[in-house]
């Protein structure tokens, strides 16, 4: 598995509606007339973590009437949703916790919680190293946050080793989805997690150890969540999973729904006009998925398919279980049904044993397939993974040099593709008034580019959430273009 990475950030989530799904968690709300408690959520890592952070806010809102804030100074609860993909992930978490400790010294009643993949790895060691942390929970137990919160607030003065029930990093099947409140969103795009964990066990990856084996949500559960989002005005869905195209959800009759079939079901949900998904694995990118691109216009013309290396030798060492020829053949089949497809991928540069020839294979692959963009990083060991036992025989200086060369190739490709959009007409979903250009609306094209176009005051209201076509006149940046409104499709 490979995750698309974001810079660590805090996200604000709208206050959720009441729902019966948390009825079994009979926690008290704030007393009448008392100000609502506020929770600040710092999110690191992939889209799965962004999704999980939204659910953390929803769970605490539903159980304790909390509201999410993006102002850390006013928060009553601080939650860190951690990611273990990047180098020295654990130390970065403890470094940030050190800064949070100062906030707790100023506000002793402040509750601090650590969740996500680092929490899953470290467990109760987090409270041993940082005893001011009140609760620790894994990706599969975020639905138990209300219970952990209640237990932590009653044990403020208890030493970490004597606390009871404030650490839960277990893997309780996929039950968390059964206890989450109904989704509540603002905007026209939403993430929907369709599965958890990964069973591919790539030699460099910690995900199977932090999120567990692959477990797919039942088909009806996934569709019910998407239906609810569509009723709230969502028009674009991104299906999430560490190995999303390995989805095998159970149907009512006990049969299994595979990923390609799921795409057809989602495409028939009233109101959903766009479907994206991440992160996929080449082993699971089957012909029936490619056929879905030929049949479903809702599937966008953008695919993120991590390859990690252009060298068969390195792919074997990574235990990716496919070759470059297989990968290229898949892309060629896809291009045959979607010639306008934009590709992105993940790459690890400087994996143990990578020679100059191996690196050139990776560079040549990037040039041959003309990737639109990529998430590329130098290799660093992840504790507990098979690759961590390999000799890290590529010097840091060489890794950095190769990464710079590789990323320039990708940047050049991105810029070229953006320049080629000038003169073309793109379908765009309008989302907001542009902050820097108040006379213009901002939307997203199928190929992920941000698109600006001038709009009247009336259009600034009428076109929100609508699909339009825009003829591109110039580019603003490698990932943003500007154009003129051609037609309103809704």
Swiss-Prot record:
Q: Which InterPro entries match?
A: Elp3/MiaA/NifB-like_rSAM, Methylthiotransferase, Methylthiotransferase_CS, Methylthiotransferase_N, Methylthiotransferase_N_sf, MiaB_methiolase, rSAM, rSAM_horseshoe
Cited SMART domains: Elp3
Residue intervals of the Radical SAM core domain? 184-416
Similarity field: Belongs to the methylthiotransferase family. MiaB subfamily.
Cofactor(s) required, per the database record:
[4Fe-4S] cluster
Q: Which reaction does it catalyse?
A: N(6)-dimethylallyladenosine(37) in tRNA + (sulfur carrier)-SH + AH2 + 2 S-adenosyl-L-methionine = 2-methylsulfanyl-N(6)-dimethylallyladenosine(37) in tRNA + (sulfur carrier)-H + 5'-deoxyadenosine + L-methionine + A + S-adenosyl-L-homocysteine + 2 H(+)
Q: Cite the entry's keywords alphabetically.
A: 4Fe-4S, Cytoplasm, Iron, Iron-sulfur, Metal-binding, S-adenosyl-L-methionine, Transferase, tRNA processing
Q: What does this protein do?
A: Catalyzes the methylthiolation of N6-(dimethylallyl)adenosine (i(6)A), leading to the formation of 2-methylthio-N6-(dimethylallyl)adenosine (ms(2)i(6)A) at position 37 in tRNAs that read codons beginning with uridine.
The molecular function terms of the Gene Ontology recorded here are: 4 iron, 4 sulfur cluster binding; metal ion binding; N6-isopentenyladenosine methylthiotransferase activity
- Cite the binding residues for [4Fe-4S] cluster 2: 198, 202, 205
Q: What class of enzyme is it?
A: transferase
Asked if the record carries the keyword Protease, the reply is no
Record domain TRAM: where: 419-487
Q: Which GO terms describe its cellular component?
A: cytosol
Q: Where in the cell is it found?
A: Cytoplasm
Q: How does it assemble?
A: Monomer.
| Binding-site residues, [4Fe-4S] cluster 1 | 46, 83, 117
Entry coiled-coil feature ranges: none
This entry's Enzyme Commission designation comes to 2.8.4.3
Reply yes or no: does the keyword Membrane apply: no
The name this protein carries in UniProt is: tRNA-2-methylthio-N(6)-dimethylallyladenosine synthase
Q: Where are the transmembrane segments?
A: none
Residues forming the MTTase N-terminal domain are: 37-154
The cofactor binding remark recorded in the entry reads: Binds 2 [4Fe-4S] clusters. One cluster is coordinated with 3 cysteines and an exchangeable S-adenosyl-L-methionine.
Per the UniProt record, one Pfam family is TRAM
Query: Its domain of life?
Result: Bacteria
List the source organism: Psychrobacter sp. (strain PRwf-1)
